[in-house]
Amino acid sequence: MTVQRHSKHFEPEITAFYCIYCGYMAADTAGALNVQYPANVKFLRLPCTGKTDIRYLLEAFEQGADGVYLVACPIGNCHHVRGNERGRARVDRARRILDEIGLGGERLEIFFMSGSQAHSFAEAAHTMTARIRELGPNPLKKIAPLPAEGRDMPVPGDDEDVSFRGRRPDPTQRTE
């Protein structure tokens, strides 16, 4: 996959998974020390990075993430003995899949750090933001999502009512 420069105004959407031990403590320490990191990163907790499923990583891209990373305990210091090593193996496998489908394995990363490494936690977010900004938006974002519940959405020009023009109606609002 070739790297293309994109607008500086492109703000990537990044999903970060972190374990409840070192990853969470690093995030908490960063907050306590007021260490700044990009606001474009959405964090999701895992019991352990060893519980990371390749499907979760790939689904994050399907849901529109431009980049994904994991924050794991340091190698040899996992609270679940080898969970971080299992997480690394799953990231490696998911990278190969991303390369095979043409999305690019460089959009996925794993960082190892202890709970006291607040600056490393922030640096991981900065590193991924810069990398994804260089790579550009997730090409899957250009593909329209499937309609809810498998229903066909009306196409402008059909005889059907197209008043919502691709927007899904709010099911909580009553229509008379």
Could you tell me what each predicted segment is?
Residues M1-E176:
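Iron-sulfur-associated redox domains of electron-transfer enzymes in respiratory
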